[in-house]
Amino acid sequence: MLFPELSLCGYPPEDLLLRLTVINRGPDPSELTVLPTIWFRNTWSWGLDVRRPRMRQGESGPGVSAVEFDHEYYGRRRFLCEGAPDVLFTENETNTRRLYGDSDGAPYVKDGINDYVVHGDKSAINPDRIGSKAAAHYVFSTQPEQPVTIRLR
């Protein structure tokens, strides 16, 4: 079960705090995987806007992972993840290989994070740690009814 809580810091108004609490509701100890994900809406593939914003691994501090990005409209931003999780990067692109058998499809596609986490496909995420979609990869070993909290900014 997931309980999200969003708080506004005040200034600047775009500075958001997010607290996610996940609880193992099963009767047995369990491993929980949580993937807080950020992405840019794909407007470049459809000719609406050819500019493609980029995210990249940012400078991380003790106990924190960072994603940095520049956007023409939103400016320079950072996504901070408490606990220093690995951050997985891919593109917010449709997997045309899987859907249509297109051999020229993008190498890193929107379902790449799923393929990495669920199927262990290391080639599904960008090793250069850049893309238009990123997810913080948290894995917790929990006891029954044990809550785990993640804080993001």
Residue ranges and their predicted role:
Residues 17, 22-110:
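Polysaccharide-binding surfaces and accessory modules of carbohydrate-active proteins
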Residues 1, 11-17, 27-31, 146-147:
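Coil-to-beta-strand transition motifs
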